[in-house]
Structures are given as structure tokens and as C-alpha cells.
Amino acid sequence: MANILKRWVESDKRTIRRLDKIANKVEAYADEYGKLSDADLQAKTPEFRERYKEGESLDDLLPEAFATAREGAKRVLGLYPFHVQILGGIVLHQGDIAEMKTGEGKTLTATMPVYLNAISGKGVHVVTVNEYLSARDATEMGELYNWLGMSVGINGAEKSPEEKRAAYNADITYSTNGEIGFDYLRDNMVVYREDMVQRPLNFAIIDEVDSILIDEARTPLIISGQSEGTTGMYKRADRFAKTLTKDEDYKVDLESKTVALLDEGIRKAEKYFGLENLYDTDNTALNHYLDEALRANYIMLKDKDYVISDGQALIVDSFTGRIMDGRRFSDGLHQAIEAKEHVEIQEETKTMANITYQNLFRMYKKLSGMTGTAKTEQEEFREIYNMEVITIPTNRPMIRDDRSDLLYPTLQSKFNAVVKEIKQLHEKGQPMLIGTVAVETSEYLSHRLDEENIPHVVLNAKNHAKEADIVANAGQRGAVTIATNMAGRGTDIKLGPGVKEVGGLAVIGTERHESRRIDNQLRGRAGRQGDPGMSQFYLSLEDDLMLRFGSERIKNFLQRMNVEDDDAVIQSRMITRQVESAQKRVEGNNYDSRKNVLQYDDVMRAQREVIYGERQQVIMEEKSLKPVIMPMIKRTVERTVQLHMQGDAKDWDLDAVVDFAQAAMVKEDSISVADLKGKSPAEVEAYLMDRVDKIYADKAKQLYDAGQMLEFEKVVILRVVDSHWTDHIDAMDQLRQSIGLRGYGQLNPLVEYQRDGYQMFEEMVADIDYDTTRLFMKSEIRQNIQR
């Protein structure tokens, strides 16, 4: 460990020496810019923008732009960034993480790289953990940016789409991580480009970067659609499907496991559901229910594909013949089977779109972050986000007294000691911040302090605005604040009058967190900006971390030292080392777990990029989507011909090709087997595509203008893509949950997931092609399509 620390320190020293040279260039402009009038300083912004347009890079502009922001901060905010803050700003501009201790002015540090990068006009996002901090920083720092001629937007959950669009179109946008993620997902669900709110993701500076990119890395952002109210539709579709006659109303293709309505079946469906045209784009949802009802009734076999047990439809694994507990068919097929068998139809909320923070933030062209604690996770930041963690020196030397851990045999004896310490420090008026890992612990400790008549405040994360006030007052003389898991990040604890004289803020940890980083955050609340302060952790052999790791060795150590008294205390570097080694093991496990999630999510990321890219192409198109639709139809035709016209001509199934053409492309009486006889597979494909071209031309004539045709094409493609994509997300989720079992068969679950996921994606693309073909070719176009 000592060697690793040494390497870190030496590597940082080299980096800081390199950054010092750039920072010195910034400081060299101080006198010159200090003499400029306000108007001349403000005129620098349009000058920089012009120079950027003419080819100067942001790196070229850095010294002057940083000097401008620095002088502006002095005039507008009354704050003048120190040399170390310039260093931090350069690290952020370079797309790395600036590790700056609490109280070193991270918010002011960010103003310089934010201003510099906003010059490009491509947008800068300042990302915070909650809306309170977002609004606070945007309001305070916004004064500086506005003065320098930059626009500032605040994004929030309550904002309307118009307000969000305005916020994202500003030069600088303040937002929470969650809201950026949900806006990204919603933008990829809209039908019209004017409904989108975001611009391409350009540059983000994440405040408390470890909290967002590590602690919340595994949290998926999910937009769910309500599928309630669909039970009735499954039942109606099922009742209709049961009235049909094989080969008269529908045709089954066992090879491809598909079932399609024939013209008579379509006519019956239109009569049954009271429709003019079953394949009108307004009936996409009904078509879905009908398709699933047909599959459930005429493809899926009871006691082969599924069994009914205790009023539930359970899937049978086709390989093992075993029941697959907890698994459900996706795409609504399971509900269709439940309707078929008259058992209770289980509603499901449907995932419409999802993404993890890991993959959201990796989409930015440039990403940077700042925090007081990131060095312990350096490897993860480098490997997953390609960001280095650079420790920025403090402006004043740190004099906080970090004491070795105190270890007690029992929880009871530990808390007795904690309460005793609080009493002693409270008597001399020294303010205290007491960190607990769990809410129950903070409530227990609060109860103990009530018994001792010690006034105190308990902090939980329910009210961010109030929380910030409580944390800000935690440095006043005599204040006692109990905080769970570092509530109040982002707010400085400033020392009140007379507090330095009694030793500054005392931080007391009531147990070690499983992450060293969280412990370091707690310690870091004391001793800001060269203030005095103290930190002390109290542990017991009954703490969670000690029970899980390393406790045996420590017990043996205590026995060797003949420690039998419950109130005995041990203060030893060996104890601290043991605890840190336990923490490192947990951190390693957590990192492996996050990396594992990312490897699985990367499969979805690649697929998401393809689908969202296609959606973007469709939404942004302004002339015609014929170049998109025609290849989809061509691929569908080719797949069908290849499936049914393989090998010798005597084995070809021309009836199946005709059935396909009638179901998905042309009027039923307009094509027969005679039209295809004597043709090679390539000639059949050419013949069918020729028919497609004619139908396309007819549709174009039916509409007033190209704009109407484009609108029709967009609606068809987007409805089909979105319907299949949401089903695919569900299917991939189910695959992900079940794939671990393959590990028992000596198969690599990740490789299996990648392979099956790719296959499912290919199948989905084929389904999208087919449904787009069917909807586009079979729809009757009404005049004047309404949005």
C-alpha cells in the first residue's frame, strides 16, 4: 500500500508541475486584465468566440479565458481564485477529476473551465446531486456568467418541455444527473424533432463526481409505461382468435412459428372490432394484441411450451423440460396465454426506455468532475471513464488531527465511550459532527443524548434546503449534529466565533463505512482551509464491517493482550490497518460488481445506439423516408424468399411466399402461385419489389404532397420501432435475470448473454422490418393526415 501511495503522490507531483506552467500563464495576465474597464473585460467573450470560430482551440484560449473569468469573479462575486483553484480548473478542462479538499472552493474553481468551454457554443452541463445545489450554484455563479455575456439555464423535474429546451439551449446548463438522464431517454421517445429538449451531449463537469459515477453507477434510470387497462384487450383478442378457422381465416407457418390472418380473417376482425381498416396506423396496438392472441392459441402448446399450475401459466424450458420459475414470455405473449387459459392476467409495467449513469455520462464528448474524495477509486475512474484523478494541493497547510481508531469489545461499550466523549467536548463548547452509517444508529444515539440533556440536531436527507442550513450551522460553538452517511455534501461547515480557540470542528465516526471514501468524506468536514479540527472513529467487534471481515485476527490480538473488560479500549495502528484491509476487500468486490453490470449494460448500449440512431434519422428527415423504408421491405422480401425457396425447386414452398405477400404487401386476389412459377429466387425477389415500387407510387399519389407522405412514413416507422424496442428491453431484462444459471453448466454467462442478446436483436430488427412492411403496404391512406 505504501508503494502505491508513493506512486500516486509522485505521479501527481509531476502532473502539478506541468499544470503549474499553464497556471502561471493565467496569472501573468492578472495585472493587465485588472486595469481593463468593465466594458473591455466583458468584450473579451465575443472576441474569444470569434477567435474560436477562426480556428483557435480552447487550449489556445485557456490562459486568457481563465484570466477573464478570474478577474470577472473578483469584480462580480468579490472572490479571486487562488493558484490552486486555477490548477483545479485546468484539470477539469482537460477532462479529468480534480480532487479538492472540503472548503477549497470547488464551485469557484469550476467557473473558469465552464466559461472557457461555453465559448464553443456547444453547451456546458454543470451536474449536481440535487436540485437545491443546482439552483443555488446557478443563481450564485450565474451572476458572473451573465456579466460576462453567457446565458445560464436551470433544468429541473418540474420544468415544462419549453423551459427545459431553453435551459439546454443556454451556454451553461445546471441540472441534476437524474434529470439529464430522463431528458435523454424522453428525447429518444418523441415523434417530432420540435419535442426534443437536449442538444448533443458536449461537456459536463460533475460535482461530487464519486457519488454520481461510483455510488450511483449501478442505478438504472427507467421510464416505465403503464400497461394497465390492457387486460380487457387481451381477453377480447382471445375471444376473437377462438372464432377463427384454420386455412380459411388464418395460416400457420410452423417453420418460422408465425401465424397470419388471411383476407377473410381480416374482414372478420374489422367487423368484430368495428374498424374500416385493420392495418390503419391507429390500430397498431390492436394488431399487437391480435398477433399475440393468434400465437397463444395456434402456436403455443399447453403442456409442451407451458403448463398451468395453481392458476398460473408457467414456462417450460424446451431444452430441459423443467418449469422456469419466475420467468414470463415477453411481448405480451404471456398475458395472451393467460387469457387463452382463463387464468388471472398479470399486469406488468413496461420498461419503455432505460440507461445507467455509467453509460449516460460516457456519451459526453468530454467529461470531468470534482470531489474531495476520489483517489481511492482512481483505477475505476481510469478504466471505466478514462479520467485521471489529480489531487490538488490545499491553499493553506492542513492541520487537522486525524487520530487512530478506538476499538471496543461490544457495541454497548463503544456507544458509552462515544456519549462520554460528546459530553466532554460539549462542555468546552467544541462543535461536533457525528457520522453514523445507519438511520437506526442515529436515532439510538439521539435518544442517548436526550437522556444526557445534550441539545443536538439529527440530519437525514429528506429536506435538502433545510439540510444545507443545518450543515452550515454545524460549525457554531456548542453545536452537536448527528448525520447519516454524509448528508449535506456540497455545503461547507464554516467555523463560528470562538470555535478555533476550542479546537475547531470535531468529527466523530461511530463506525467505519465499507468504503474508505465515505470515511474520508466524513473526516474532510473538519479542518477546512487550514482551520484546526479533529477526527476520531469509534469501532466495536460487533460492527457490521468487523463481523464480516477481519474480526478473528483482531479477537486473537485482544486475547494475546488479555483484554477481557467490556469497557477496555484499544488504540493501535494494527487495528486501523486491519479495518482498511477489510474495506479494500469490500471496495474490490463492489468495483467488480459495477464492472460486471457495465459489461452487461454495454450489450444494451450498443443496441440502444443503433435504435436511437435510427429514430434520430427518421425524426430529422425533412424530405422523404423512402431510402429508409425500401431497404426494410427489401430485407423482409429476401428473408421470406430465402426461407421458403431453399435447395431444389421441387422443395420450394411457393404457397408460403404467396401467403406472405398477401398478408404483408398486396391485395389477396392480386397474386397467385402461377405468378411465381418458373422464376428463380432472385427473380421472385425482383418481381415482388417491382410490385412494391408500384404500390409506393400509388400511395404517394393518394396524398396531397411530399410532406403528407413523409408524415405517414414517420408514424409507421416510429410506432413499429418503439413497440418492438420496448418489448426487446423487457426480453433482454429477462435474459439478464436468467443468464446466471448458465454459469452452473460451465458456460460464461456474459458470453452467453452477448450471444443471445445479439441473436434477439437481429430477430427484433427482422420483426421491425416485417411490421413496417405490413403497416406501410397494407394501410389505406386517408387524406390530410393529422399530427
Curated annotation (Swiss-Prot):
<dbReference type="InterPro" id="IPR001650">
    <property type="entry name" value="Helicase_C-like"/>
</dbReference>
<keyword id="KW-1278">Translocase</keyword>
<dbReference type="InterPro" id="IPR036670">
    <property type="entry name" value="SecA_X-link_sf"/>
</dbReference>
<dbReference type="InterPro" id="IPR000185">
    <property type="entry name" value="SecA"/>
</dbReference>
<dbReference type="GO" id="GO:0006605">
    <property type="term" value="P:protein targeting"/>
</dbReference>
<keyword id="KW-1003">Cell membrane</keyword>
<comment type="subunit">
    <text>Monomer and homodimer. Part of the essential Sec protein translocation apparatus which comprises SecA, SecYEG and auxiliary proteins SecDF. Other proteins may also be involved.</text>
</comment>
<dbReference type="InterPro" id="IPR011115">
    <property type="entry name" value="SecA_DEAD"/>
</dbReference>
<keyword id="KW-0963">Cytoplasm</keyword>
<feature type="binding site">
    <location>
        <begin position="103"/>
        <end position="107"/>
    </location>
    <ligand>
        <name>ATP</name>
    </ligand>
</feature>
<keyword id="KW-0472">Membrane</keyword>
<dbReference type="Pfam" id="PF07517">
    <property type="entry name" value="SecA_DEAD"/>
</dbReference>
<dbReference type="InterPro" id="IPR011130">
    <property type="entry name" value="SecA_preprotein_X-link_dom"/>
</dbReference>
<dbReference type="GO" id="GO:0031522">
    <property type="term" value="C:cell envelope Sec protein transport complex"/>
</dbReference>
<keyword id="KW-0547">Nucleotide-binding</keyword>
<dbReference type="InterPro" id="IPR014018">
    <property type="entry name" value="SecA_motor_DEAD"/>
</dbReference>
<dbReference type="GO" id="GO:0005524">
    <property type="term" value="F:ATP binding"/>
</dbReference>
<feature type="binding site">
    <location>
        <position position="492"/>
    </location>
    <ligand>
        <name>ATP</name>
    </ligand>
</feature>
<dbReference type="GO" id="GO:0065002">
    <property type="term" value="P:intracellular protein transmembrane transport"/>
</dbReference>
<dbReference type="Pfam" id="PF07516">
    <property type="entry name" value="SecA_SW"/>
</dbReference>
<keyword id="KW-0811">Translocation</keyword>
<keyword id="KW-0067">ATP-binding</keyword>
<dbReference type="InterPro" id="IPR027417">
    <property type="entry name" value="P-loop_NTPase"/>
</dbReference>
<comment type="function">
    <text>Part of the Sec protein translocase complex. Interacts with the SecYEG preprotein conducting channel. Has a central role in coupling the hydrolysis of ATP to the transfer of proteins into and across the cell membrane, serving as an ATP-driven molecular motor driving the stepwise translocation of polypeptide chains across the membrane.</text>
</comment>
<dbReference type="GO" id="GO:0008564">
    <property type="term" value="F:protein-exporting ATPase activity"/>
</dbReference>
<feature type="binding site">
    <location>
        <position position="85"/>
    </location>
    <ligand>
        <name>ATP</name>
    </ligand>
</feature>
<dbReference type="InterPro" id="IPR020937">
    <property type="entry name" value="SecA_CS"/>
</dbReference>
<keyword id="KW-0813">Transport</keyword>
<protein>
    <recommendedName>
        <fullName>Protein translocase subunit SecA</fullName>
        <ecNumber>7.4.2.8</ecNumber>
    </recommendedName>
</protein>
<dbReference type="GO" id="GO:0005829">
    <property type="term" value="C:cytosol"/>
</dbReference>
<dbReference type="GO" id="GO:0043952">
    <property type="term" value="P:protein transport by the Sec complex"/>
</dbReference>
<dbReference type="Pfam" id="PF01043">
    <property type="entry name" value="SecA_PP_bind"/>
</dbReference>
<dbReference type="GO" id="GO:0005886">
    <property type="term" value="C:plasma membrane"/>
</dbReference>
<dbReference type="GO" id="GO:0017038">
    <property type="term" value="P:protein import"/>
</dbReference>
<dbReference type="InterPro" id="IPR036266">
    <property type="entry name" value="SecA_Wing/Scaffold_sf"/>
</dbReference>
<dbReference type="InterPro" id="IPR044722">
    <property type="entry name" value="SecA_SF2_C"/>
</dbReference>
<comment type="similarity">
    <text>Belongs to the SecA family.</text>
</comment>
<dbReference type="Pfam" id="PF21090">
    <property type="entry name" value="P-loop_SecA"/>
</dbReference>
<dbReference type="InterPro" id="IPR011116">
    <property type="entry name" value="SecA_Wing/Scaffold"/>
</dbReference>
<keyword id="KW-0653">Protein transport</keyword>
<dbReference type="InterPro" id="IPR014001">
    <property type="entry name" value="Helicase_ATP-bd"/>
</dbReference>
